[in-house]
Regions:
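Solvent-exposed, non-transmembrane regions of integral membrane proteins
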Residues: 1-669
Length: 669
């Protein structure tokens, strides 16, 4: 324990040295110009002692798109050429140069400058000491952690408390009979069209992904009236008059329903227009903005967004099908009907780009499915010939389509949650060992199925996006569900509470992912997030959160055991929590300093007292308290259970409170 406390003192000393001796500021360089002065954060000018000049600045984009992948600055000194980009710092004479911004004309670059001769080295020494001490505690013999392990695994298997949850019934809704007959779009034609690629949200993706986003945005689920998302999307593209009459647009706000003249929450696109062919919400929105009526703006925002999503489809924003390689090697994508300008195409190719979608629409409307399939194949082949270096492979296209079909969390999440609750009840009321064993086996199989399911989802999302799926709230909660299941499989045999609570906690994590973020679009990573250190940082932190969540559920079971007078069980559960506390705190500490190293590499500072950093530190300190042997009152079973339950509020604040309510550098998460 001495080394742990010493490491924190060294880390604090490093922070003090950084605060007292470090200098920070910015330099603004224009192409070909040199400077030896940086502007500090206080507005003062500081002589660097050497001159730097901007040689080049460029923005690298993801292949085939205009989405920024990296910003690269090359500067020259008297004797060196430095290349600086996101996650790549330039070093010269003790100064660190970080990419901070650029001029709109791409002829200038703004660099952050940081000079910290002592603080970083001392802080890193503290991190190393902390890591060594944590390893010693986790692997050492005769430690309190070992004693708690023996106590937690002694005796009979532990049961799980029953948890009462009221589940709301999903609303049933019906379709109004439509006066106009729908064109029957062949499912094979729709599926083939769904595998054609488009440029969408600065990413090259199959139309199936656009269709899922489009339909989910309109009606809240990726299907409608027994039709797949791609079939519905094809209807909106090729059978516009009918689909404009379908009441599939969900309007939740009562004020918006009133202005649109609705009797319930379902609207058609035609409901947005009055008898004079004017948009019904245009005047109320303008009036609300003029008066600063934020309440009215909020009421109408969702309905207005859904209206404009359909308008975006009509404007071609969702159907940029045809790639054209420009002279600079970059690609421009054209939608059907869009002006092609002076692009260099022969007459036959130009006709194909302009007319192929018209021919496809004609074939679908007349029911000529073989011709429609042939045209879809030609568009698909055209893309793979004209943009073969940027179009996803056939395997990745099929993988993304499969992911879109598989990634419907509502039904499996509710099923997993219901089963895990029922198994908890069964484990609690089982009166004999045989029934408990049956419940235990079913719990194990449920855990395995959930683990394989979440593993497949994460793997497919990783393959499709090209980066580890831990860049937003939805992905991190999915990863936490997976991490919980992995811990359950790894530790469940020794710790029955972990085995019984694992599927339940994982189900709640999936439920939170479903409720808070729904299913966000897969997007390209912003440049600063393209670091392996970030992936490791998030991964380690989420494993620690999974352990803290398990400990909170175990604490609730321990309090329940105390109320029933089962002191032996209460004591054993306290030992289980105490044992899990060691790896949980260790993972959190390691995750925090990996994040600090990433921040130091990315923008030159390892700590900025951002709200996420501050709350992560508070969480670590609060969970570290029970590890101190001097705090005898925290070693009493009931006290430790109450403490663990309350401490989990810090985890909730660190994750949800900071991500969704507080502003800071971690807002992108």
């Amino acid at each position: 324990m001495f080394l742990i406390h010493a490491s924190f003192l060294v880390i604090l000393l490093g922070a003090l040295l950084s605060w007292t001796t470090a200098q920070s500021g910015t330099i603004h360089l224009r192409l070909g110009e040199a400077t030896n002065v940086m502007k500090t954060t206080e507005g003062n000018s500081v002589d660097l002692g050497f001159k730097v000049a901007l040689k080049t600045f460029r923005m690298d984009c993801y292949p085939g798109t205009d989405a920024a992948m990296d910003y690269v600055t090359e500067i020259t000194t008297s004797d060196e050429l430095l290349e600086i980009s996101m996650n790549k710092i330039g070093y010269y004479h003790g100064f660190r140069f970080m990419q901070s911004g650029y001029d709109s004309d791409m002829q200038g670059s703004i660099l952050g400058v940081y000079h910290d001769p002592w603080g970083i080295a001392v802080t890193y020494l503290g991190y190393a000491m902390l890591l060594i001490s944590l390893i010693a505690i986790l692997l050492g013999k005769g430690t309190r952690m070992r004693q708690l392990y023996r106590k937690a695994t002694a005796g009979n298997a532990l049961k799980v408390a029953a948890v009462a949850v009221v589940m709301a019934l999903s609303p049933l809704f019906s379709l109004n009979s439509q006066a106009q007959e729908r064109i029957n779009i062949n499912s094979h034609v729709a599926d083939g069209f769904g595998r054609v690629c488009v440029l969408y949200n600065s990413r090259i993706t199959p139309i199936n992904t656009v269709a899922v986003d489009f339909v989910t945005k309109l009606c809240g689920k990726p299907s409608w009236d027994g039709l797949s998302a791609t079939e519905v999307f094809c209807g909106w593209v090729f059978d516009v008059p009918y689909w404009e009459t379908v009441k599939m647009i969900e309007i939740k706000d009562k004020k918006a329903q009133e202005l649109l003249g609705l009797n319930d929450k379902w609207a058609s696109f035609n409901d947005f227009w009055d008898e004079y062919n004017e948009y019904k919400l245009e005047k109320p929105l303008k009036e609300a903005m003029r008066k600063g009526d934020t309440k009215m703006q909020k009421s109408l925002r969702d309905a207005d967004e859904k209206f404009n999503i359909v308008r975006m489809l009509y404007g071609g924003e969702m159907l940029k099908l045809f790639p054209y390689r420009q002279a600079d090697g970059k690609y421009k994508w054209f939608a059907p009907g869009q002006s092609l300008g002076n692009i260099n195409l022969d007459e036959k190719e130009l006709t194909f780009v302009r007319k192929s979608m018209d021919y496809l629409a004609e074939s679908i409307i007349t029911g000529d499915n073989s011709r429609a399939s042939e045209i879809v194949k030609k568009i698909y082949s055209y893309q793979h010939v004209k943009a073969k270096d940027v179009i996803p492979s056939k395997f990745l296209i099929y993988a993304e389509v499969f992911y879109n079909r598989l990634n419907t969390l509502r039904l499996p999440t509710m099923l997993y949650l219901s089963l895990s609750l029922l198994l908890g009840v069964a484990s609690t009321i089982a009166l004999n060992q045989k029934k408990r064993k049956i419940a235990s086996k079913v719990t194990l199989w449920l855990t395995v199925i959930m683990f394989l399911h979440t593993s497949l989802l994460l793997l497919l999302r990783w393959m499709v996006s090209g980066h580890l799926p831990m860049s937003n709230g939805f992905e991190t909660m999915q990863f936490m569900a997976w991490a919980t299941l992995l811990l359950t499989l790894f530790m469940g045999k020794r710790f029955m509470p972990v085995k019984n609570f694992g599927p339940l906690l994982s189900s709640f994590a999936l439920l939170v992912a479903m409720i808070t973020d729904g299913n966000p679009q897969i997007t390209q990573l912003m440049p600063v997030l393209q670091s392996p250190l970030l992936s490791v940082h998030v991964m380690v932190i989420m494993f620690s959160y999974a352990l803290f969540g398990l400990m909170a559920l175990i604490a609730a079971e321990g309090i329940w055991a105390h109320r029933r007078g089962d002191l032996a069980k209460e004591d054993q559960l306290a030992a289980t929590s105490g044992f899990l506390l060691y790896p949980a705190v260790s993972l959190l500490a390691v995750g925090i300093f990996i994040g600090a190293v990433w921040a130091n590499v990315s923008w030159g500072r390892y700590w900025s007292w951002d709200s996420k950093e501050t709350w992560a530190l508070i969480t670590m300190l609060i969970y570290s308290a029970p590890l101190h042997s001097d705090l005898k009152w925290l070693h009493k079973p009931l006290h430790i259970h109450i403490y663990m339950l309350l401490a989990f509020l810090c985890v909730l604040m660190t994750y949800f409170g900071v991500n969704y309510f507080l502003a800071g550098l971690h807002s992108y998460a």
